[in-house]
Design a protein with these regions (language model features):
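Signature of the first transmembrane helix
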Residues: 3-60, 153, 173, 210-237, ...
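Interfacial segments at transmembrane-helix termini and the short loops linking adjacent helices
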Residues: 103-120, 302-333
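Membrane-proximal transmembrane or re-entrant/amphipathic helices at the cytosolic face
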Residues: 429-481
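Membrane-interface junctions at transmembrane-helix termini in multi-pass inner-membrane proteins
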Residues: 121-145, 330-361
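Helix-loop junctions and terminal segments of transmembrane helices
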Residues: 27, 56-72, 245, 249-288, ...
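Hydrophobic alpha-helical transmembrane segments
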Residues: 118, 143-190, 208, 249, ...
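Interhelical loop/hinge segments that connect adjacent transmembrane helices in multipass membrane
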Residues: 4, 139-142, 166-173, 182-223, ...
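Alpha-helical transmembrane segments of polytopic membrane transporters and translocases
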Residues: 27-28, 39-56, 211, 226-228, ...
Length: 481
C-alpha cells in the first residue's frame, strides 16, 4: 500500500504550484481581460461544467472507491476498469453531442466562446484520473497536473495580450486540461488491461455510478448554479467579481480536497479489508483537527489581508471583491470538517444515502438563498448563500456520522484553533491600518506576521492541549513516514 504521507506530499507539491501560478497569471488576466470578459468566460464555463457533470456521471468517486477495493487483484481490476470506462466513453460522447446541439439552438450571445468550452466537456471522455486515485498512484496525477499548469502558464503570457483574446484564453484554459487527461493514457497498458466487459457488469457499475451521480448533482447546484443565477439576475460583471473572489479561496482549498482525495482510497481499501474499525476512527479524529487547523489558518488569513490583497492582486477595478472574499473565505473550516467526514466515513462505508441527503439539503438551502438574496445584494448575496450552504452540509453530515465518530473531543480542539485564527485576524487587521509602506510590502508583512503568530499559537495549543507533547516530538511525528 502506497505511503499516505508521500501521496499527500505529492498533492501538496501540486497545490503549491497551483498557488504560485495564479499569483503570476491572475493579476495579468484580470487587467488584460477586464471584469466583463472574465464574466463571459466564467458564465460560459459554468454552463459547460453542468454538461461535464452529467458526462462524468459520478464516475470519479465510484471509480476511485471501486478500484481501491480491488487494487491488489489484477484480474478484478481489469474487469472493473473496463466496465467503468465503457460507461464513461458512451456518456462522454452522448453529452458532448447534446452540448453542441444546445449551443446551436439556445445560445445567442457569445456563441463562439460557448463552442470553445466544448473542449472542456470533451475532457470527460479521457479523464481516467479515478483509476490512479484508486490505485493510490498520486505521483502520476500530480505530474500530469504540473505539466498542464506550466503549459497553460506559458501559453497565457505568449498568446493573450488584450481583451480581444478571450477566445484564445478559453482555448488555453480548456485545451490544457484536455492535454493533461491525455497524458494519463501514456503507458496505461502497464497498469491495467482493457477486457471485454459483460452487460451485467456494466449494469452493476452503472448503478453504482448513478448513486454517486446524485450527490454530484447536488454539489454542482451549489458550486455552479450560483454563477448561473448571478449571471442571469445581476449581470456578468457581478459574476466576474464573485468568480475572482472564489478563485482566491479555491486555490488554498486544494489543500483540503487533496487530503480527501488521498484518504478516500486509503479508507475504502481499509473498509474492504475489514481493518477500518478503531484504527479508522482514530485516523479520522486526528484528520478533523489537522484539517480544521489548516483551513482556519487559510480562512482567517485570507480575510485579514483581503483589503490589501485585492488591489495588489487584481487591480482597483476589482475592489468590490473585498467583502465577497472576506465572507466566503470563512466557509473553509466547515468544508474541511465535512470533507474529512465524507471521505473517511460516509463514502468508504457505503453510507451513500446519508451522503446524498446532506448534499441535497445544502443544495436546497443554496437555491433558496440565492434566489432571495442575489436580486438585492448581487454578488454578496451569492457569497452569503455559499457560506450558509457549506455550514449546512457540514452540520448534516456531522449528525449522520455521529454514531461512528465521537465528535466531542475533536470539536473542542477545533474550536481552540478557530479562536487562534480569530486572534490572528484581529492582529493583522490592526496591523494593516498602521503600516505605511507600499502595498506589496504591506501585504508581505501582514502575511508574515499573521502566519508566524498562528504557527506559534497553534503549536503551543497542540503540544499543550491536543496531544500534550513537546514541539520536538511533534516535528518527529510530522516527518515520520
Amino acid at each position: 500500500m502506497a505511503s499516505f504521507k508521500r501521496n499527500y506530499l505529492y498533492q501538496v507539491l501540486y497545490e503549491i504550484l497551483a498557488i504560485v501560478l495564479p499569483l503570476i497569471t491572475a493579476p495579468y488576466i484580470s487587467r488584460v481581460m477586464g471584469a466583463e470578459n472574465l464574466g463571459i468566460f466564467s458564465y460560459s464555463h459554468s454552463v459547460a461544467n453542468l454538461f461535464l457533470m452529467i458526462a462524468r456521471l459520478g464516475i470519479v468517486n465510484h471509480g476511485s472507491r471501486s478500484v481501491a477495493a480491488c487494487q491488489k487483484d489484477s484480474e478484478n481490476l481489469n474487469r472493473v476498469f473496463s466496465e467503468i470506462f465503457s460507461i464513461q466513453a458512451v456518456f462522454g460522447l452522448l453529452v458532448t453531442t447534446v452540448y453542441m446541439v444546445y449551443i446551436a439552438l439556445f445560445v445567442k450571445e457569445n456563441q463562439f466562446i460557448f463552442f470553445l468550452q466544448s473542449i472542456f466537456v470533451i475532457t470527460a471522455l479521457f479523464d481516467i484520473g479515478w483509476l490512479f486515485m484508486g490505485l493510490e498512484n498520486f505521483k502520476k496525477t500530480v505530474t500530469r497536473n504540473i505539466v498542464v499548469k506550466l503549459v497553460s502558464l506559458f501559453s497565457i503570457f505568449a498568446f493573450v495580450h488584450d481583451r480581444g483574446d478571450l477566445g484564445i484564453y478559453t482555448i488555453i484554459s480548456t485545451g490544457s486540461m484536455l492535454l493533461g487527461h491525455l497524458t494519463l493514457w501514456l503507458g496505461l497498458n502497464k497498469v491495467v488491461k482493457f477486457v471485454k466487459p459483460s452487460l451485467l457488469g456494466i449494469w452493476n457499475q452503472l448503478k453504482g455510478c448513478f448513486v454517486m451521480f446524485i450527490p454530484t448533482i447536488a454539489v454542482t447546484i451549489y458550486t455552479v448554479i450560483d454563477k448561473v443565477l448571478l449571471g442571469g439576475l445581476a449581470g456578468e460583471t457581478q459574476v466576474g467579481y464573485y468568480d475572482q473572489a472564489s478563485k482566491l479561496v479555491a486555490v488554498p482549498l486544494g489543500f483540503i480536497t487533496s487530503f480527501g482525495a488521498v484518504m478516500l482510497p486509503r479508507m475504502s481499501a481499509m473498509e474492504a479489508e475489514g481493518t477500518h474499525g478503531n484504527e479508522g476512527i482514530a485516523i479520522t479524529k486526528k484528520s478533523l483537527v489537522f484539517m480544521v487547523a489548516l483551513a482556519t489558518a487559510i480562512s482567517f488569513g485570507l480575510a485579514s489581508v483581503s483589503e490589501t490583497l485585492i488591489p495588489v492582486y487584481y487591480g482597483k477595478e476589482f475592489l468590490a471583491c473585498i467583502p465577497i472574499l472576506m465572507l466566503i473565505s470563512v466557509k473553509l473550516p466547515f468544508m474541511a470538517w465535512a470533507n474529512v467526514i465524507r471521505t473517511q466515513c460516509l463514502i468508504p462505508k457505503h453510507r451513500d444515502k446519508e451522503y446524498i441527503i446532506s448534499l441535497f439539503v445544502g443544495a436546497a438551502v443554496n437555491v433558496v438563498l440565492n434566489a432571495l438574496l442575489i436580486p438585492k445584494f448581487m454578488a454578496m448575496g451569492a457569497a452569503i448563500a455559499t457560506f450558509s450552504t457549506e455550514a449546512t452540509v457540514c452540520l448534516v453530515q456531522t449528525i449522520f456520522a455521529r454514531d461512528v465518530i465521537p465528535f466531542k473531543k475533536p470539536l473542542l480542539h477545533c474550536m481552540g484553533f478557530i479562536l487562534i485564527g480569530a486572534i490572528m485576524y484581529a492582529v493583522v487587521y490592526v496591523l494593516s491600518r498602521t503600516l505605511t509602506f507600499g502595498a506589496v510590502l504591506n501585504l508581505c508583512i501582514e502575511i508574515g506576521v499573521g502566519g508566524l503568530l498562528f504557527i506559534i499559537l497553534a503549536v503551543a495549543f497542540y503540544c499543550g492541549v491536543v496531544e500534550k507533547c513537546s514541539p520536538k516530538k511533534l516535528i518527529k511525528q510530522l516527518l515520520k513516514k
